[in-house]
């Protein structure tokens, strides 16, 4: 190598370092833009998160089994552990079963029954309704299709139902209705398992109540870290703050009807539940995020601490008892924060993951398979079992 070429090496190295720094800074700007838009996750005001109000239906906080909730955590743990053991560390973000779930109170024992891990007999399709803002940051997130690919190996399938990122649950319910009615009508038993994540859960429930024509096409409904009872954090947020998500790089979303934050307020959700009993004839299941405190990503610590002023048993966005659908079957308490359950930031943006979204790793593929396997097994039982 010539001396002149040797002299060029430091400048080339410096140039490459500048490119890396610029790329990293761009990623950080994206993260900060997203986080500043989501100020409802952890605003700084000191007013009560649940302000005094008499505008509320009568409510109680009671043990789940005394409130019409069937506790099937023991059987779900058996299925989930079997899936994790069978698929092994080759799965993305693999965790041992004991670390993937949180034991809360006295968990029922497993049944000891055999677990089917082969091809699905019913070929269930998970139709996922995403949470607030997803349509805004989806292009930037660029999530891999690993869950869909994994499920298809075993005769299941999955699809995403597109709903407005920033609109009300009532508005999005119509979009859910239209998406389901556009799907091929089943020639036998229904195969669609609606899964509502975060705000997607109340969107899903409003669709089931308002549009009875979709019910015959639905096999079951699942709340996954669903904002069933709303979030006290939404009491301290305004819609214009959520609307900032429109400025995330590559975002194509609009403000819609500007009703997303209102739909997440506890008073709104609880009043809706009081006035709208869930339709009979469907099976309802709840997956609850109940992370150990050390499983909260660093960027979500402020909202976790803020919500802890009401109850520290939260996932940084929702308190654990606000995630359970009335009359549902409780499947699991998951040891993951709100984002880790369904938003794979660290997989597609590892630098941001390492710096901010530090606890984002979770075996979502195995969890999705376990949910569908439990539902398929449960649907084979007669109603009321």
For the regions a protein language model found, what residue spans apply to each?
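N-terminal secretory signal peptides that target proteins for export/translocation
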Residues: 1-26
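Serine-dependent carboxylesterase/thioesterase catalytic core
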Residues: 174-274
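C-terminal catalytic-base region of ester-bond hydrolases, centering on the histidine
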Residues: 279-385
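Active-site catalytic motif of lipid deacylating hydrolases and related acyltransferases
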Residues: 117-191
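Flexible, membrane-associating and regulatory peripheral segments of lipid-active enzymes
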Residues: 2, 44-140, 150, 383-385
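Bacterial N-terminal signal peptides
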Residues: 31-42
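Solvent-exposed loop/turn segments at secondary-structure junctions
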Residues: 132-135, 164-167, 198-202, 226-230, ...
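Structural recognition of the beta-strand scaffold that forms the well-ordered cores
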Residues: 126-128, 159-162, 193-194, 222-223, ...
């Amino acid at each position: 190598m010539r001396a002149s070429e040797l002299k060029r090496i430091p400048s080339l190295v410096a140039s490459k370092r500048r490119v890396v720094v610029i790329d990293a800074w761009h990623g950080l700007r994206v993260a900060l833009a997203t986080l500043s838009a989501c100020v409802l996750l952890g605003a700084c005001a000191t007013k009560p998160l649940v302000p005094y109000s008499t505008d509320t239906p009568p409510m109680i906080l009671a043990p789940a089994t005394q409130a019409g909730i069937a506790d099937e955590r023991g059987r779900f743990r058996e299925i989930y552990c079997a899936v994790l053991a069978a698929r092994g560390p080759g799965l993305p973000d693999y965790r041992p079963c004991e670390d993937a779930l949180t034991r809360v109170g006295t968990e029922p024992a497993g049944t000891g029954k055999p677990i089917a891990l082969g091809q699905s007999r019913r070929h269930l399709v998970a139709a996922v309704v995403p949470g607030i803002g997803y349509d805004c940051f989806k292009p930037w997130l660029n999530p891999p299709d690993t869950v869909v690919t994994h499920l298809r190996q075993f005769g299941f399938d999955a699809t995403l139902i597109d709903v407005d990122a920033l609109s009300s649950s009532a508005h999005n319910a119509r979009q859910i209705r239209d998406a389901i009615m556009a799907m091929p009508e089943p020639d036998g038993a229904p195969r669609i398992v609606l899964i509502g994540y975060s705000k997607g859960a109340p969107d899903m429930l409003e669709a089931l109540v308002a549009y009875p024509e979709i019910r015959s096409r639905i096999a079951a409904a699942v709340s996954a870290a669903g904002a069933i009872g709303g979030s006290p954090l939404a009491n301290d947020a305004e819609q214009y703050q959520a609307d900032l998500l429109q400025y995330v790089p590559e975002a194509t979303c609009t403000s819609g009807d500007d009703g997303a934050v209102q739909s997440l307020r506890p008073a709104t959700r609880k009043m809706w539940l009081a006035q709208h009993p869930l339709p009979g004839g469907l099976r309802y299941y709840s997956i609850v995020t109940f992370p150990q405190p050390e499983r909260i990503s660093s960027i979500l610590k402020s909202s976790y601490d803020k919500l802890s002023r009401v109850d520290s048993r939260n996932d940084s966005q929702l308190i654990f008892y606000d995630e359970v659908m009335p009359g549902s079957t409780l499947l699991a308490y998951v040891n993951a924060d709100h984002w880790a359950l369904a938003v794979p930031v660290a997989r597609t943006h590892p630098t941001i993951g390492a710096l901010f979204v530090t606890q984002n790793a979770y075996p979502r593929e195995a969890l999705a398979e376990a949910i569908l396997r439990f539902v398929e097994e449960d649907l084979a039982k007669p109603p009321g079992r």
